Amino acid sequence: MGQIEGGFVQGLGWLTTEQISWNVNGNLSTYSPSTYKIPVSKDIPEKFNVDIYEKGLNIEKTVNRSKAVGEPPLMLALSTFMALKNAVNNNNLKSPATPENILMALQE
């Protein structure tokens, strides 16, 4: 379960908080967690339901036959971004959907 939750939260950060910027020399300014905002525990949804399909075809003897489940949930975070896009009623909302980008989308 932790792999699935972690993948989703990683995607949540990618699409809502992790703003990338470069300095005047073209060097990346946001190169580590100390220079950009990553999700923290309070950013994780309070209610987070995960179900594993028990009748899958994976034969690996892992917990709940859950081999390779860490990466796909990253893309599930698109649901959050799309919900924000829908909430501001603007298809031009830029990613990451930071408060600044949301405000700009609302003002268009």
Where are these regions (language model features)?
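C-terminal catalytic domains of large/alpha subunits in multi-subunit enzymes
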Residues: M1-E108
